[in-house]
From Swiss-Prot:
GO terms for molecular function: small ribosomal subunit rRNA binding; structural constituent of ribosome. Binds as a heterodimer with protein bS6 to the central domain of the 16S rRNA, where it helps stabilize the platform of the 30S subunit. Part of the 30S ribosomal subunit. Forms a tight heterodimer with protein bS6. Belongs to the bacterial ribosomal protein bS18 family. GO terms for biological process: translation. This is Small ribosomal subunit protein bS18. PROSITE patterns: RIBOSOMAL_S18. Transmembrane segments: none annotated. Keywords: Ribonucleoprotein, Ribosomal protein, RNA-binding, rRNA-binding. It comes from the Bacteria. GO terms for cellular component: cytosolic small ribosomal subunit.
Amino acid sequence: MVNRRRKKMKKKVCTFCADKSSKIDYKEVHKLKKYVTERGKILPRRISGNCAIHQRDITQAIKRSRHIALLPYTID
């Protein structure tokens, strides 16, 4: 068996906590697209690097913008 060492993942800093003036808004589609995969799924917190509070806000904003057709549910 090969002995593999795991690299320690560096914890990402939440972009919204670092920049206090930045707000999460469902109408700002260009910001929300960073947190959606190419298949249309919402990125998990461990990949996006957001804190729990802001991840919930991003998820809610993405769902709102999908509902009013600013963001697509799926991407072909």
